[in-house]
Amino acid sequence: MDKLKIEASEALAGNVVISGAKNAALPILMAGVLAETDFVVSNVPNLRDVKTSCELLRCLGAEVSRGDNSEVRISTTSLDHFCAPYDLVKTMRASILILGPLLARFGTADVSLPGGCAIGARPVNLHLHGLEQMGAKIEVEEGYIKARVDGRLKGAHIFMDMISVGATENLLMAATLADGETIIENAAREPEVIDLANCLIAMGAKIEGAGTDSIRIQGVESLKGCHYRVMPDRIETGSFLIAAAVTRGKIRCVDADPSTLEAVLAKLEDAGASITTGSDWIELDMQGKRPKAVNIKTVPYPGFPTDMQAQFCLLNVLAEGTSTITETIFENRFMHVPELIRMGANMELEGNTCIIQGIERLNGAQVMATDLRASASLVIAGLVADGTTIVDRIYHLDRGYEHIEDKFKGLGGHVERTQ
């Protein structure tokens, strides 16, 4: 099993190219099921979850090809299976996003209950309840969601009990081929939802309000394929900016989108970073200074993202002052804290809040990645830890970061993949 070996590094410096957003690419790939003609998606990152998504589409009978670049081609003319099996779904929670497209286009779907990062319940009931309101008959048997609809789904006025990106995306895709109008209230506003909506519109869907808490969809008879480019990964961008901040460096993230990171950039400025942006780049310069502690509370977009919580925990561990970080989105999302404490961090958990007293340096140690974003924080911690840090179980990292060791090396970081 691969590991990352990290040595203490100097201030990071240089340019890093940001990959396409995994959390946008996965639903967009699933949306290919809705298209009756060939569908081409570019700027798709080469990640384990993307490979699993492509394999899932092939399992359903779709033709999926990927060249040497970041482009994926999908043809569903031969799609003739409607079951997403456990062996594929167990490793990736986003597999549930195949449910809406299959049901909307073919009227039937069997999808194994999903896996993915172990950071809380993240129940699928919001997905199922919304589809039932659209006329689907759903049963859960032997670990499988079995969904059927006679004819086409029907438009519905859906009020979601809580904000859910995945449920918003699933219902949005399903509604594009439903009879009549669907309105999704309390919808997620994340940029990845907007990216999916823009892709669906390019395929012929009629959607208004993506990016607000009320999305209106007029169902159409059919959707066609298109050529669509996935948005930049805002969480990868934020992770590299944190790495530059804690190493007191200066980097530029290119092929990035600053408009999707306003809450993160504001907190980095509060921490003492000098931030400069262009239309597709972000530059951070710490001017050799130690970051200042910042208080964080995770909330749905456009507030501070839960996917940046672990990275800001690390920033505060090394910052000047005392801080609190409160997690309101997922339970069990402080599993990186015991590992950082093993490296010398001064932090304490009280319920869903972490209290952190900043220190100057960490000590290298052998640590274990527990989920995708926690693993990123541990790798960055290794850059500012005296001695050697070994991060085990980096298959979590490979689910969300493309060529991370090469990108860090390009900035001057001492990161090496080993067995």
Swiss-Prot record:
Q: Which of UniProt's keywords are assigned here?
A: Cell cycle, Cell division, Cell shape, Cell wall biogenesis/degradation, Cytoplasm, Peptidoglycan synthesis, Pyruvate, Transferase
SUPFAM superfamilies in UniProt: EPT/RTPC-like
Q: Where is the active site?
A: 117
Give the E.C. number(s). 2.5.1.7
Question: Keyword Transferase: yes or no?
Answer: yes
Pathway participation: Cell wall biogenesis; peptidoglycan biosynthesis
Entry-annotated residues carrying 2-(S-cysteinyl)pyruvic acid O-phosphothioketal: 117
Sites binding phosphoenolpyruvate sit at 22-23
Q: What is its main location?
A: cytoplasm
Top-level EC class: transferase
Write out the similarity annotation.
Answer: Belongs to the EPSP synthase family. MurA subfamily.
Function (record text)? Cell wall formation. Adds enolpyruvyl to UDP-N-acetylglucosamine.
| NCBIfam families per UniProt | murA (TIGR01072), PRK09369.1 (NF006873)
Q: Mind telling me what this protein is named?
A: UDP-N-acetylglucosamine 1-carboxyvinyltransferase
Native species: Shewanella sediminis (strain HAW-EB3)
